[in-house]
A protein has these predicted regions:
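Glycine-rich phosphate/pyrophosphate-binding loop and the adjoining helix
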Residues: 1, 125-159
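Short hydrophobic beta-strand segments
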Residues: 1-5, 116-125
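N-terminal beta1-alpha1-beta2 submodule of the flavodoxin-like/Rossmannoid cofactor-binding fold
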Residues: 1-68, 74-95, 143, 154
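A generic local structural motif
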Residues: 54-57, 103-107
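Glycine-rich anion-binding loop/nest that anchors nucleotide
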Residues: 70-72, 94-98, 102, 121-123
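Short histidine/acidic/glycine/proline-rich micro-motifs that form metal-
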Residues: 74-76, 123-128
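Short, conserved loop/helix-junction motifs that constitute active-site signature segments
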Residues: 108-115
């Protein structure tokens, strides 16, 4: 399965790519709630978010993905608020335990799978500093999410 997570207007995405039976598109429908940091997904019902807003099954979806594509406006070298919220709500994909990877502390993975991670940042005048911050963040995301391989692209416009 391929998951496309984006913050584009729906019409713009429809004009750019075709959905298939093997793809799932996650877009900002204004219904997502912020992670409460309650750790229900780790302690009470492992792998499942307590907030029932349609985004409570992200960990399960990630576990079935072969490829995750993120299309996000670049905000100071990071994701847009919607994309950041999706990634925050994906924490049930990980376990509440830690291990050392590359001399850094990271969560252990819940699912013994990996996927390809393709990230497209768009925006006018993305600075070199913002690009470096974004690259560093994506590399850390990839370690945390047990990503097999990844690509990062920076685009002036996403048409």
């Amino acid at each position: 399965m391929e998951i496309i997570i984006h913050d584009l207007p729906e019409e713009k995405l429809k004009n750019m790519c075709k959905s298939t039976d093997n793809s799932l598109i996650i877009s900002d429908d204004k219904k997502i709630k912020n992670c409460m940091g309650c750790f229900y997904c780790w302690t009470k019902n492992p792998g499942e978010c307590r907030i029932k807003d349609g985004y409570d099954n992200l960990a399960e979806l990630y576990s079935k993905a072969e490829k995750i594509i993120i299309i996000s406006r670049c905000c100071y070298g990071s994701y847009s608020p919607f994309i950041k919220n999706i990634l925050d709500r994906s924490i049930p994909y990980l376990l509440p335990f830690f291990k050392i990877k590359n001399k850094e502390m990271h969560h252990t993975i819940r699912y013994k799978r990996s996927f390809y991670f393709d990230v497209y940042f768009y925006g006018k005048n993305i600075s070199d500093e913002e690009k470096e911050i974004a690259k560093s963040m994506i590399k850390a995301n990839c370690i945390n999410l047990n990503v097999a391989n990844f690509n990062i692209s920076f685009l002036e416009n996403f048409n």
